[in-house]
C-alpha cells in the first residue's frame, strides 16, 4: 500500500559568511548554519494491509519550530542533496487485457 503523509519540515536560508584562509582553520570552524529543527515531535500512523506478524506502524517527525544552527546528524539529513523517493517503492502489479504481468 502507498500512504500519503503530510507533515511540516524546516527549510529555508540562513545568513552565513564564508571564511578566507580555510587551509589554516580546523574543520569544525568551517561548518555553516542551516535551517534545522529547534523542536520536533513524532507522530505515528497505522499502515493498512500489513500481515498480522508485522507491526503496522510508521513514525515520522513533525517540526514544531525551526532555527538557524549547526546540522545535527542525530536527527537530520545533513547532506547537500537528499535522495529523492517521492514515489511508492512497493512493486505494483500491472494488468494488460485481463492478464497480470
Swiss-Prot record:
GO MF term list: hormone activity
Keywords from the named record: Disulfide bond, Glycoprotein, Hormone, Secreted
Full protein name: Thyrotropin subunit beta
Similarity remark: Belongs to the glycoprotein hormones subunit beta family.
Subcellular location: Secreted
Lineage: Eukaryota, Metazoa, Chordata, Craniata, Vertebrata
Main location class: secreted
CDD domains listed in its UniProt record: GHB_like
Pfam family of the protein (one): Cys_knot
Gene Ontology biological process: G protein-coupled receptor signaling pathway
InterPro entries: Cystine-knot_cytokine, Glyco_hormone_CN, Gonadotropin_bsu, Gonadotropin_bsu_CS
Disulfide bonds, paired cysteine numbers: 2-88, 10-66, 14-68, 71-78
Residues bearing attached sugar chains per UniProt: 6
Subunit description: Heterodimer of a common alpha chain and a unique beta chain which confers biological specificity to thyrotropin, lutropin, follitropin and gonadotropin.
Transmembrane segments: none
Highest taxon above the source species: Eukaryota
Gene field: TSHB
A GO cellular component annotation in the UniProt record: cytoplasm
Function in brief: Indispensable for the control of thyroid structure and metabolism.
Keyword match Nucleotidyltransferase: no
Amino acid at each position: 500500500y502507498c500512504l500519503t503523509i503530510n507533515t511540516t519540515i524546516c527549510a529555508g536560508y540562513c545568513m552565513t559568511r564564508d571564511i578566507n584562509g580555510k587551509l589554516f582553520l580546523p574543520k569544525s570552524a568551517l561548518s555553516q548554519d542551516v535551517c534545522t529543527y529547534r523542536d520536533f515531535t513524532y507522530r505515528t500512523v497505522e499502515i493498512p494491509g500489513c500481515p498480522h506478524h508485522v507491526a503496522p506502524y510508521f513514525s515520522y517527525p513533525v517540526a514544531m519550530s525551526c532555527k538557524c544552527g549547526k546540522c545535527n546528524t542525530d536527527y537530520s539529513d545533513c547532506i547537500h542533496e537528499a535522495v529523492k523517493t517521492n514515489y511508492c517503492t512497493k512493486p505494483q502489479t500491472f494488468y494488460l487485457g485481463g492478464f497480470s504481468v
